Amino acid sequence: MIKLIIDGSEIEISEGSTVYQACIQAGKQIPHFCYHARLKIAGNCRMCLVEIEKSQKPVASCAMPVSNGMVIHTDTSMVKKAREGVMEFLLINHPLDCPICDQGGECDLQDQAFRYGKGTNRFHENKRSIKDKYMGPLIKTAMTRCIQCTRCIRFANDIAGIEEIGAINRGEHMEVTSYLEQTLDSEISGNMIDICPVGALNSKPYAFKARKWELKHTASIGVHDAEGSNIRIDSRADEIMRILPSVNEAINEAWISDKNRFCYDGLKYQRLDHPYIRKNGKLVEVSWSEALKTIMDKIKSVKPEKIAAIAGSIVSVEAMFMLKILLQKLGSNNYTVNQFNYKIDTSERGNYLFNTTIVGVEKADLCLLIGANIRQIAPILNSRIGRRVRIGALKVVRIGIGHNQTYKIHDLGNDIKIIEDLAVGTHEYTKAFKEAKYPMIIVGDGVYGRDDGYALLSLIHKVVDKYNMMRDDWQGFNILHNHASIVGGLDIGFNTAIKFEGVKLAYLLGADAIPFDKLKSAFIIYQGHHGDVGAMSADVILPSAAYTEQSGIYVNLEGRPQIAQKAVSPVGRAKEDIEIIKEIAGYLKIDIGMDNLQEVRIRLAKEYNIFANIDKITANRFTQFISIDKLSQEPIAARPINYYMTDVISKNSVTMAKCVEAKEERKRDVAKVFY
């Protein structure tokens, strides 16, 4: 530890820390623009100047390492004058257009100019003006406001892992731009908006919509992937205006994916706001009572074993649990959250989780990807892995036809024999796995989405056992899930095998990806919030609330249950999921023993211990899975997906549609350059 004095008070701080960090630890406010705790140090804005005794000039505190016996002053006349000078330089070419800037009210430059600026301007020459750069459909630029802090450049390089933003020219003529002014290629590019300290980078979908003080903030969870990123929903009245990240060091740090951030406009389109019944081949708007009575009559006319329920990809645990209880009361055990027919072993909880945990990947030294498209399935997790690779702390190898990643990967091939050789210890990478202290395997849908998924999973378990990847001090076996609801559904046993051909009544709880051709003779009830495939195939439609319109628990891929809070009211005559299921039970005169959300959660916590530990990861058992199924010789390949359209909300998002179009245009432009 190093001892130093800051404004007369002695503190201790670890060696290697900066003067800025020491000042913050001492409780001092140090203005800054270029410094960001999660980015590499640049030291180019000079706003964080402090006075250090025996130094003739003020020092940039963010770039100066501490040394023993340092005496630092943060509030002397020299420091004040230096900061005023720096601020004056920063404002020389700034347009001062705060009334029309989207950053107004939450702008670092505004706040620090007021707190540390002179209040007068001696510059009366013409200001420079810079042409706005095109960065795609998500980021709106106003580059005349840019103060060249380079935060966005460092984020692109160090966090996103794609070097697609840089600076051209020098001095006063310096400009920040994307290469060839193309659409940004990163799935987490929207985070540049958050870290920009001025109004140079803004959200295009949010442009000129609202001011910060007009918005209500609601803590929630991103449901468009299985990572469970913490988000903040900003709304005005009953309209969602924007979505921002909330800090959670164990999951998403301070970042979220572009899909979780921008696809909220999909909540405006194709919404189901009234109950419907199919009459004479056409869906007709009806009252709730008529829809519920029709369902009651149909359920009573069908044998219990012919009734099945399928949950979709963004359904809360409470809704699935309540529907499961209802079906059990009816005498049916046909219910599943596995609408894609994934081959996932559920014999123990550790067999279907991401056991290493998201933050735990920073401890791993060797990672094997098998059939996993981690960049598009879990962009935030991918960013963590990429940062470890770039500093040389982690080596990543891959089996399976993959997709372009944001870091260096060594491809072993796509043959199943590679896994067989690893399992018996004859592959060239056997030595690397034996020497690795913390090896991990990430299994994607290129494995559990195959017809022989169980057989392949059994083979992978042999590799896990061979290299002792699951032990008391390290859990290296990981399933990379695609959807927000699947782990929660597996946790409550909402996962029985269903033969669709024999189903006479299908209850679709937001499920749109099932084999509808096998349900041609079934009566279909669709409970959901968007008019997608499921609604178009339904005989009765029950409009429900989206995840922003009701509170619900979601369990992320590492097994952490979290609560998404209600931000706005349901549209039209739509109701919350558990309210609809409770009303159906009432019409059937079935007592499911739960009248409200609180009672559902109390019962969940009693029956499943994990739900008594919200926001926590519990210890889980893992057992080796053995399958007698036959392996095919089909090459392993991660399943291709359209990243921007993976669920009913993102499919109906205009912003996501623009992203798809922009990415296609980028591919065509790149092809022109190289071919």
UniProtKB/Swiss-Prot annotation:
Residues 215-271 form the 4Fe-4S Mo/W bis-MGD-type domain. CDD domains: fer2 (cd00207), MopB_Res-Cmplx1_Nad11 (cd02773). Residues 78-117 form the 4Fe-4S His(Cys)3-ligated-type domain. One of its GO terms (molecular function) is quinone binding. [4Fe-4S] cluster 2 binds at residues 146, 149, 152, 196. [2Fe-2S] cluster binds at residues 34, 45, 48, 62. Keywords: 2Fe-2S, 4Fe-4S, Iron, Iron-sulfur, Metal-binding, NAD, Quinone, Translocase. Its cofactor is [2Fe-2S] cluster; [4Fe-4S] cluster. Its EC number is 7.1.1.-. The keyword Iron-sulfur applies. Binds 1 [2Fe-2S] cluster per subunit. PROSITE patterns: 2FE2S_FER_2 (PS51085), 4FE4S_HC3 (PS51839), 4FE4S_MOW_BIS_MGD (PS51669), COMPLEX1_75K_1 (PS00641), COMPLEX1_75K_2 (PS00642), COMPLEX1_75K_3 (PS00643). InterPro entries: 2Fe-2S_ferredoxin-like_sf, 2Fe-2S_ferredoxin-type, Mopterin_OxRdtase, Mopterin_OxRdtase_4Fe-4S_dom, NADH_UbQ_OxRdtase_75kDa_su_CS, NADH_UbQ_OxRdtase_ferredoxin, NADH_UbQ_OxRdtase_Gsu, NADH_UbQ_OxRdtase_Gsu_4Fe4S-bd. Pfam families: Fer2_4 (PF13510), Fer4_NDSU1 (PF22151), Fer4_Nqo3 (PF22117), Molybdopterin (PF00384), NADH-G_4Fe-4S_3 (PF10588), NADH_dhqG_C (PF09326). One of its GO terms (biological process) is ATP synthesis coupled electron transport. GO terms for cellular component: membrane. Residues 1-78 form the 2Fe-2S ferredoxin-type domain. PANTHER family: NADH-UBIQUINONE OXIDOREDUCTASE 75 KDA SUBUNIT, MITOCHONDRIAL (PTHR43105:SF13), RESPIRATORY NITRATE REDUCTASE (PTHR43105). Belongs to the complex I 75 kDa subunit family. This is NADH-quinone oxidoreductase subunit G. It comes from Rickettsia typhi (strain ATCC VR-144 / Wilmington). The lineage of its organism: Bacteria, Pseudomonadati, Pseudomonadota, Alphaproteobacteria, Rickettsiales. The gene is nuoG.
